[in-house]
Amino acid sequence: MYVIVVDFDIRPDRLAAFLPLMQENAAASVRDEPGCHQFDVCQDPDAPHRIFLYELYDDRAAFEAHLASPHFRSFDAASADMITSKHVRALHRL
């Protein structure tokens, strides 16, 4: 399995707008992408503007399909000015 973890820092004044966009992207990913098995959106309780994603795909090709999906492209465009930093890591689940 192919794992993606993402750490976001979100502008605090844009957090309320960002969260529903992210939650809809996560739901659409699991619902509409056969290769996406899990998409968890987590929030740091001590720093609510820090968002962590855990995504589980069949393989890299399934993740690439996610990046090309209409729901991801829409989310990416809508949230671009809300994000102050983003760190993405790809891992293989053992």
Predicted regions and their residues:
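Short, flexible helix/strand-to-coil boundary loops that buttress conserved ligand/catalytic motifs
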Residues: 22, 66-67, 76-79
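Generic structural signal for individual residues within well-ordered alpha-helical segments
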Residues: 16-19, 64, 73
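Short, well-ordered beta-strand segments in beta-rich or mixed alpha/beta enzyme
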Residues: 2-9, 38-67
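Short amphipathic alpha-helical segments
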Residues: 14-37
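Glycine-rich beta-strand-turn "strand-cap" elements at beta-sheet edges
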Residues: 40-49, 75-94
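Short phosphate-engaging motifs
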Residues: 14, 59, 71
